């Protein structure tokens, strides 16, 4: 069973990864937000681009996908299924999210992939994020 990392362990893992990659960053904190509408209440107006991050599983439950796209866009799961050619998708459970990403609903981020030591989760980025 996966042990839930503490908030400080999560922060330390991300900052250590960014430091090792020599990526400059500033930390901003806000509560976990299950919707973009709630998250927007905490975002700074600094020109940053924000994403929706959704965690899916395939119909067999043996493949998992983190999908990141512009927060101002909508996503049709059926369109995503057709584009990714991965079969029927559904949202992964909180237990799967914790097991593979070390995260809870409302806090999904690509940084959760740091916790995926076995590289089980497939990451898909919306091409529109290239222009951020």
What residue ranges belong to the model's regions?
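Extended, low-hydrophobicity, polar/charged segments
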Residues: 1-132
């Amino acid at each position: 069973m996966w042990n839930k990392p503490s908030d400080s362990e999560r922060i330390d893992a991300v900052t250590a990864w960014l430091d090792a990659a020599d990526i400059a960053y500033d930390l901003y904190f806000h509560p976990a937000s299950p919707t973009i509408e709630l998250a927007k209440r905490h975002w700074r107006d600094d020109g940053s681009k924000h994403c929706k991050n959704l965690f899916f599983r395939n119909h067999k439950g043996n493949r998992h996908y983190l999908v990141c796209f512009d927060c101002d866009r909508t996503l049709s799961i059926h369109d995503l299924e057709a584009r990714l050619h991965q079969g029927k998708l559904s949202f992964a459970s909180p237990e799967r999210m914790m097991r593979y990403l070390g995260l809870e609903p409302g806090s999904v981020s690509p940084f959760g992939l740091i916790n995926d030591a076995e590289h089980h989760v497939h990451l898909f980025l919306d091409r529109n994020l290239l222009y951020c």
